[in-house]
A protein has these predicted regions:
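Active-site bordering "gate/hinge" segments
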Residues: 1-232, 238-241, 331-333, 371-373, ...
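Dual-mode signal for accessory low-complexity, basic/Gly-rich regions
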Residues: 173, 184-405
């Protein structure tokens, strides 16, 4: 196969150097292997939570599902590196649906997938009971909520929503293979091209984005990547300026780096490792405000929680995002929910409008199990941590009006 394919390639493959790591073992942090828990215990926990929703007034249907993965990966290369790694991850989602003369509305839990074991389903790790208790009233309020008036609003975006905006507008945009055109015929390229490294004003001076393989319970946390590179942490955006990319050993030289930062991944032995996202996160402001103070600082705005649908162009530049909950803010106080909300911007305008970054108390690690990339397609789990943040006068669309209904 290699000999047959060789005439099609015009670039010589050369890997940047990496120290040898012989016979290394790494295991992610978790308490309870989900595969050690009986199916009946799993079903009972989900049934207990979903039945509480069904018992509430205004909830006509409830669904609950959980996914859990134990990944065991062994790597060896001809330079002498050999690693054995194991990591565990969990994702649980519970939905409440209301059906009536209004049509239907839904709302789901805000719990994020993460590198936990079955302990993730305990209330001392994530307060499931409290969220389930609040969900029916929030759903009823959403059903009765007015449709948003389109225009420009200050947006207070919760990390349960902002993680996805980071993923689409920063995570994918700063994949170096995408920036140099390797993904052009599948999922697009990037506006953040290599000629802009060190000069592109990605966002406001409050914006500090890092890539890492170290975050506790991160879905992209590993000891070594799939080219035998040890985990690292590095700056991607510093004080609002693009300063780094996600690299593997094959493409690092394109930005004059003599070492990869450990972003190679293959989702199975049948696939070649390609550059994939590490944990890509927005740093909180160490002295930043808590959530109540952020709400109090807004005269006219919307507080957005939870992710739903999104759209972004093939250069990771023009986008729009919706969410699960949209709370009106008037004169520093929450003033009921809205619906049919989407926010729309370009990547640099949006991040350039970030005027407040929340403190550590607002920080949440979000993410997804199912980031796709490559041909043949590969799936990777990814995490994005961030605090709540306030964005100045962002364009808000009414999704029903935009659909012509």
């Amino acid at each position: 196969m290699a000999k047959t394919s060789k005439p099609l390639s015009t670039d010589e493959i050369s890997l940047v150097a990496e120290p040898v790591y012989a016979n290394k073992t790494w295991v992610s942090k978790y308490e309870i292997d989900p595969f050690s828990v009986s199916d009946s215990e799993k079903k009972d926990r989900l049934a207990s939570l979903s039945s509480k929703l069904l018992a509430a007034k205004g909830v006509n249907h409830a669904s609950a599902h959980t996914m859990f993965v134990k990944e065991q990966k062994h790597y060896a290369d001809s330079h002498g590196t050999s690693t054995s790694q194991q990591r565990v991850r969990m994702q649980t989602q519970i939905d409440a649906i209301s059906v009536g003369s209004h049509g239907f509305e839904s709302m789901r839990t805000l719990a994020q997938p993460a590198g936990f074991g079955w302990e993730w389903m305990r209330n001392d790790v994530y307060d499931w009971d409290s969220e389930i208790e609040k969900l029916p009233a929030l759903l009823a309020e959403k059903v009765a909520a007015p449709s948003v008036t389109p225009g420009r609003y200050d947006l207070l975006i919760d990390p349960t929503n902002l993680w996805l905006t980071i993923h689409e507008s920063i995570g994918h945009a700063t994949e170096l293979d995408r920036a140099i055109g390797y993904e052009a015929n599948y999922a697009g390229t990037s506006f953040a091209t290599v000629d802009k490294l060190g000069t592109l004003k990605y966002g406001s001076p409050l914006m500090n984005i890092t890539g890492d393989r170290f975050t506790d319970h991160g879905l992209s946390t590993v000891g070594y990547d799939d080219e035998g590179v040890a985990g690292q942490e590095w700056d991607i955006v510093k004080d609002g300026i693009l300063v780094g990319y996600q690299l593997d050993r094959r493409i690092a030289a394109h930005v004059n780096r003599d070492r990869s930062n450990g972003c190679a991944f293959a989702d199975s032995p049948a696939h070649v490792p390609i550059q994939r996202m590490p944990n890509v996160s927005l740093k909180p402001n160490p002295a930043g405000p808590d959530l109540p103070a952020m709400i109090e600082s807004i005269d006219d705005g919307i507080y957005i929680l939870g992710d739903k649908s999104w759209s972004i162009d093939m250069q990771r530049y023009n986008f729009q995002f919706t969410g699960q909950q949209f709370h009106r803010i008037k004169n520093g106080k929450l003033a009921g929910q809205l619906k049919d909300v989407a926010y729309q911007a370009t990547t640099t305008d949006f991040w350039g409008s970030m005027k407040v970054v929340g403190g550590p108390s607002t920080y949440v690690l979000g993410g997804a199990f199912n980031c796709g990339k490559g041909q043949p397609g590969q799936i990777a789990a990814v995490s994005h941590g961030c605090p709540a943040a306030i964005f100045d006068k962002v364009n808000v669309l009414n999704t029903v009006a935009e659909a012509g209904k």
